[in-house]
Structures are given as C-alpha cells and as structure tokens.
C-alpha cells in the first residue's frame, strides 16, 4: 500500500488561490500521486474522501487540510516538507516599507489620495474594512463573498450618504477608467458604460462589444444581490447616476441575472430620468439573451452587427437520446443557458435553478452526478467555499466531466471558458485533453478577446482541435447544443 499523510491544522488561514498553487506545485513532484491542500470545508472533505485521503475524526471549516499520497515513505516525507515550506514561504520584500498594508485604514494612510479601495478578505471581516473606506470618503470594491445581506444594505446606504459607491459584495468584475479589477477582460475604451449585477455577464457583454469594435468607459459591478428585494438596487441606482455624470459615457447597459420585478421597475423609472440613454440586459424568460441585448445596443449606436467569432465542431458524435449537461463557471452564463434551453427541453435541474423544485441540493450538498438535463454553476458560493473559483482552478469541473463520461449517460456537454485578467492563464491546456479523454460532443462558450493574456483565437483553436464547437456568444453556443440534441433525439 502506498504511504499517505493526512493532517488538520488549526489557527491557520490561507487564501484559496494560494492553496491551489501549493497543491499544483506539490502534485507536480515526482513520486506524489495525490495531493489536496485546502481549507477543511465540507466540499473539500468530500473531495479528500474520494481520493481515499479523508481525515480521522471531525474537521472544522477553519482548519487547514493537508492530504498526500506518495510512492514511498521518502517521497512522502519530502512532499510534506515541501508543503510546509510552500505555506511558510514569503517573498523577499526588500525592506520594511515594502510590507503591504493589512487594513484599509493603513492602506489609505500609505497611498497618495486613492479614490477606490479594494477589499478581499474572508467575508466576516470585509464589512469593517469596507466601512472604513466609506468613512474616509472612498468608493470600495468588495471582492469578498459571505457578507450578510443586512450588512450589504447598511454599507450601501452609508455609501450613498457619503456620495461614494459600493461595488459588491461578491463583486468579481469591474473596469474603472480602463483599469481592470478582479476578473476582467482586455477591451478597448469607448462610449458604453456597464452597470453589472453579474460578473460573467459583464464580461460576455464587454467582449462582444469589443468584437464589434465598440469599447467601454467603465464597468461598475454592484454585486449579484443588488437587484434583489432585500437590497433594492441601492448600488445600481448610484452607479447609474455616476455614469450619467461621466462625459466619456454616451450609453449605459444594465446587465444582470433575473432581478426582483419591483426593483427592476424602480431602476427603470430612475433610468428614464437620466440624460444618458439606458438599455437593459436583465435576463428573464422574456429576454433570455445577452447577445441580443448587445446587438440592440449596437443598433442604437449605428454599428453593424458582426458575425460573432466561432469554430466548428464535430456534430456527428451525438448519441440518440442525448441530454444537456451544462458545466459552467459563470452564474449568469448558466442562467442564460437555462433560460434559452427550458422552452425546448422542459425542466432543467440546477444548483441555481430557475424554480426551487428543480434544485440539485440533496440536503447534503449539490448532486453533481444527477441524470437528465442539468446545468451546474461551479462558481456558486456553495461550491467555492475554501476553494479557488473555477475560472482559476478547474479541478472540480474536470472531475465532473470525467464522471459524466464514465456514467455512460448520452449527453451533449455545454461549457463556458472565461478568459481575461485573474483567470486561468491557459485554460485549454487542462480542458482540451480532458475533453478528448471524455469523448463527448462538446460545445464551448469562450468569453474573451484577442488582447486577453490567453488570446481568444489561441484558446479557440486548441479547444476546436480537441473536438469542441466554440462560440464567442454563450447564447449561440447554447442554441447550437440544443440543435445537436434536437437532431439526435
């Protein structure tokens, strides 16, 4: 039997991205056959158990799990030592002055009159840091999730009174005066301002605009809950007002998942009072298509709609009776796929369902192996606790693809791959061989631009060589997947 090491550490917290990097570094060592270095959340414990590396006894989510399997005792000892070294390593910062600030207050004291603060700490600590920024008269982007909704409301009300903006919580995408923050793409500057209660929705829209030769002035993320009844569109209203005063913004597009109806009406009434024209790209059963919203905006601007980039795939491998399996990293893109697919397929189950009765939650977590038409948002908070976002770490989605292939269920696999700053530097490097090994008919919505670090065409070519049909438009990708299912039903 190969030797293993499984331990739990208390009083240790590390960022999920750093832990993913450590796992990759150790996993690349000769003699290491399995490794998981992660916070001991229920999802990560389930992954460890599937690897045969479950810890003995009870584990707590704030404990650090180190689980390893190696070819022999010497390799195991060396790997454990390498984990310890990687976790304790610090960059040579050169001087005490180079040590980064650990609070917003300290950062504001060090910086030369910043206009914007960024908060990316565990959710329970984010509120105090964001409040400090607001009190100092700065707008704040709260990347952190896990912030209670009542605290979100309090922060946004305080920001409104202070004349600043709260972007977030759980705001993963923004572009301010051409500066990309969080997950964002390299897009040209231009006259369109985006207000986005959706990160990947904003990325899809900004990338399609870029492909049409139209740039953006700003992308102001407001957090996925802002257009809920509980929050009431507080940040959306402030962001619309800010863009209305911006001379570089000639048109505004509001991007969101399905909003609460009464909040959508309130925002629509406020938008009608602005001097800058506002068009909505809020998803709903009646308006399920972000690409159509972009095309309508291009019409407003007098810009011809281009042929959206695509690569053909192998459609002849679709088995009879195939179902739709959507494995997404972006929540809004998953919603868009379900809204487009539901009229053709009927009920589509999901961990972020269109109706509560279609939820994949079993009471003990998300059923990632459910049969039938299924769309999974792997970026949902429940699947990212203690893990890096799937746009950074594809491990969980790759495991689901392999499990689907092994199940024998006939399916068309629909995926998103999101490029840009903050995302996996080469997603096709891991995904293409996984798709080839799975042997499934695959359709990919590839969200990005040629100027992104990963390069849209480079990624599209690699995925197409693996047999996938690739589309720049998620709506087009979804409809192509539905066509494949319909032709082989």
Task: Label the predicted regions.
Residues 1-489:
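Catalytic-core regions of core metabolic enzymes
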